[in-house]
From Swiss-Prot:
Keywords: Metal-binding, Repeat, Transcription, Transcription regulation, Zinc, Zinc-finger. The gene is tfb. Belongs to the TFIIB family. SUPFAM superfamilies: Cyclin-like, Zinc beta-ribbon. A zinc finger (TFIIB-type) spans 39-70. This is Transcription initiation factor IIB. The keyword Transcription applies. Sequence repeats lie at residues 156-239, 250-331. Zn(2+) binds at residues 43, 46, 62, 65. One of its GO terms (cellular component) is transcription preinitiation complex. Signal peptide: none annotated. Transmembrane segments: none annotated. It comes from Methanococcus maripaludis (strain C7 / ATCC BAA-1331). GO terms for molecular function: DNA-binding transcription factor activity; TBP-class protein binding; zinc ion binding.
Length: 339
């Protein structure tokens, strides 16, 4: 029998090049702010996006077909474990995370205002004057030029308005990103810093589906409603911001909470607005007026009635607007309301 010799190259299996398709989703906190883009892996075998990280085996695996996309991962987390927030804060050895709401993104050093050392002991009286001077010069060197000074003022104004309106953290971050984008494109020249900050906050509220009206923002800012609206339209066009019309449903939780209405009324109002949207009754009408009318109808139907004046004061509309929207909703949705 003749045995043919097989070379090593002939026995070598053909290599299969695996190319990972990379997608970049918009992800920051609750997926409303575009700050950092994290790579999303797509399985090259089945095309699934259900990719899981197995920390015990240090592998990235496709949940659908089991293909191992990456192995021998490094654990970049802390070496300690914490079981509650208090332990996490106590054991952490790093500072606050980076934020866009501070002009230097929170990366510079800040001297604490309390006159205590690293052990928590009071600083002696003879060293307090020196600490005061260090603190003063530290504040000065954080702002190096006029542009940083203007940015610091704008972000402080933005934070002040957001605090007055009780807006969450993600809205503030989003507004800061929009304002920085306006600065980079030179959109601030010829306009007031307060006006651009208020307009950026209004756009961030709409993007994050935490709606606030122009009147509400103008009430706590130093500019009028007309200027905020004009600046908002300008920066939306220049920054290519595409925002859908405000949904009246987004106003219902806040209005219902201020009126101290139970959850049943809120759910009923949302149901009414969803049916109204399917029939096109919300198009071309102010979202606050439609939401106020739906809440008024729901409160009557659920036996926890609020007067039109009470609802109008919370929603920032007139009683006439509520009556007009009330008439449209009850007639087109066949809602029998006994007053």
């Amino acid at each position: 029998m003749k045995v043919e010799s097989v070379t090593k190259e002939e026995t070598k299996k053909p290599e299969r090049k695996i190319k990972l398709a990379i997608a970049k989703p918009e992800d920051y906190s609750n997926k409303n702010v575009i700050l950092e883009k994290e790579e999303e892996l797509i399985c090259p075998v089945c095309g699934s996006k259900n990719i899981i990280k197995d920390y015990e085996r240090a592998e990235i695996v496709c949940e659908m077909c089991g293909c191992v996309l990456q192995q021998n991962l490094f654990d970049v987390g802390p070496e300690w474990r914490a079981f509650d927030h208090e332990q996490r804060v106590k054991r952490s050895r790093v500072g606050a995370p980076m934020t866009y709401t501070i002009h230097d993104k929170g990366l510079s050093t800040v001297i604490d205002w309390r006159n205590k050392d690293s052990y928590g002991k009071d600083i002696s009286a003879d060293k307090r004057a020196q600490l005061y001077r260090l603190r003063k010069w530290q504040r000065r060197i954080r702002v190096s030029d006029a542009s940083e000074r203007n940015l610091a003022f704008a972000l402080s104004e933005l934070d002040r308005i957001a605090s007055k309106l009780g807006l969450p953290r993600n809205v503030r971050e989003n507004a800061a990103v929009l304002y920085r984008g306006a600065v980079e494109k030179g959109l601030i020249r010829g306009r007031s810093i307060e006006g651009v900050a208020a307009a950026a906050l209004y756009a961030a509220c709409r993007r994050c589906k935490v709606p606030r009206t122009l009147d509400e923002i103008a009430e706590v800012s130093r500019v009028d409603r007309k200027e905020i609206g004009r600046t908002y339209r300008f920066i939306s066009r220049e920054l290519n911001i595409r925002l859908a019309p405000t949904n009246p449903v987004d106003y219902v939780p806040r209005f219902a909470s201020e009126l101290k209405l139970p959850g049943e009324v809120e759910s009923k109002a949302i149901s009414i607005l969803q049916k109204a949207g399917e029939k096109g009754l919300t198009s071309g009408r102010g979202p606050t007026g439609v939401a106020a009318a739906a809440i008024y109808i729901a409160s009557v139907l659920q036996g926890t009635r609020r007067t039109q004046r009470e609802v109008a004061d919370v929603a920032g509309v007139t009683e006439v607007t509520i009556r007009n929207r009330y008439k449209e909703l009850t007639e087109h949705l066949d809602i029998d309301v006994t007053l």
